[in-house]
Design a protein with these regions (language model features):
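Short, positively charged
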Residues: 17-25
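Acyl-donor (CoA/ACP) binding surface of acyl/acetyltransferases
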Residues: 1-14, 28-29, 36-144
């Protein structure tokens, strides 16, 4: 479910305590980088429950887009993150098959790195992120 540009347009999410922090972050993010669907933030829903969130960190720049995702705590370790990541990849490739898809993680093995590996991302190595410091950068390698 797309997260829209303003709080007023996101009333359904604004009343959900699970969305408080991420909704504000997305709206603030749009103010910095712009609102350019489909390269926006999303909530993932299953059976009427919010199960996670997903985002593109802005529209592609130099034909490269970075993805980000998270799983609600009550839905972790059930494949939700893997499915969310897959949907971001599919949306990217459907929108622009030539786009290079990347992701960044903390520089250690984790559930997030495993999710990327399951979705055909390969570790490129260390990069310095302006917000997060030293991180691992990953790139999607196989077309769906």
């Amino acid at each position: 479910m797309p997260i829209k540009q303003t709080l007023e347009e996101n009333k359904a999410f604004a009343s959900n305590p699970l969305c408080n922090e991420s909704l504000s972050m997305c709206i603030d993010f749009y103010k910095r980088v712009g609102f350019d669907p489909p390269w926006i933030c999303y909530y993932a829903e299953e059976g009427g429950d919010l199960i996670g969130n997903a985002a593109f960190k802005g529209r592609p720049i130099n034909n490269t887009v970075e993805i980000s995702y998270g799983t609600m705590e009550s839905h972790r370790q059930h494949g939700v993150g893997t499915r969310i990541c897959k949907q971001l990849v599919e949306l990217s490739l459907t929108t622009d098959p030539s786009v290079r898809i990347t992701a960044r993680t903390l520089p250690e093995k984790s559930y997030s790195t495993r999710i990327l590996e399951k979705n055909n991302f390969v570790l490129l190595g260390f990069v310095t992120d302006p917000e997060d410091g030293d991180v691992w950068e990953w790139e999607y390698k196989n077309k769906i």
